Structure formats: C-alpha cells, structure tokens
Amino acid sequence: LKSAQEHLAVAIQEVRRISHHMHPQILDELGLSEAIESIASDFSKRTKVPVQVNKPALRKLLPDFINTTLFRIVQEALTNIQKHAKAKSVLIALSVESDWLTLIIQDDGVGFEIARTQSKGIGLRNLAERVEHHRGKFTIKSSKMGTKITVKIPTASFVNHFNESTIHSDKNDNNNER
C-alpha cells in the first residue's frame, strides 16, 4: 500500500508539472502582452540581444487557448534565436485587426535553410501545428539577413471571445492587464 501511495504521489506531481507546462502561470499573472514583454526582457538579459516588443494591451480579449499558443510560439522562437541565429536584435510584433490576429517574430541573425531544418527538429513543426489547429497560417522566411516568423490566426476562430472595444493602445493604458 505504501508503494502505491508513493507511485500515486509521483504521478500527481507529474500531472501538475505537465499541466503547468501546458498553460504557463505567467499568463494568468500578467496577461499575454505583459507575459511576452517579460520573456523578451529575460531573453535580452540572458543574451544581451535587444528585443523590441510592439503589442496592444489585450485586456481579456483572447481566450486562454490562443494566449497559450502565442506565448509558446514566442518562447520557442526566442529559444531558437538564442541557440542558432547569432542575432543582434529581435522584433516581436502582435496586432489584432478586424479579421486576423498577427504575430511577427523577426531577427537579424544568420538565417537557416528551412527545408533542411524541417526534417530534423520538431520545434518548428510543433509551432505550425499549434497555429493550424486554430485555422491559422504559419510562415517562415529566412535568409542570410535573418529570419521572420509570421503567425496569422483568424479572429473567427475565437470570435465568441473577441471584443474590439477591449483593445487599448499601450500608450493610452499603462495598467497591467488581467
């Protein structure tokens, strides 16, 4: 019985770890815009590569499943930039227009051969699958001048959660989003 309890405790810890990994706590604490700002700041401190973040204040605009997808894409892209790009600067731009939510992550690094990478790693494939799950478009353009990831998710995929009146410019709204 004691062994079963120990195994159950380990299993519960693993479920907790997985669930925290699936939905980052930082999203609940800060909201998407500030969570992106936070991981960009951490990236800059760690790598000494400046990151410019352009974003609207998305106060209760996007559902958790979209926030998690976008956050994970930024997280994975920054990891790839740190490991491979040799970039001197990074741009992260998030915007919401009438029909599309768009996320752009761009660096000025050394670039890579997309076809060669797709067969080796699962990171980029996982990102594309996350976006396609929301009926979105995931594109990567890379050259010796850098790499640009563009994610477009139709607002129709979260239309029941979308309320354009909740979009505020960061310049007009300095409060933390919740």
Which role fits each region the language model picked out?
Residues 1-178:
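Coiled-coil dimerization/phosphotransfer module
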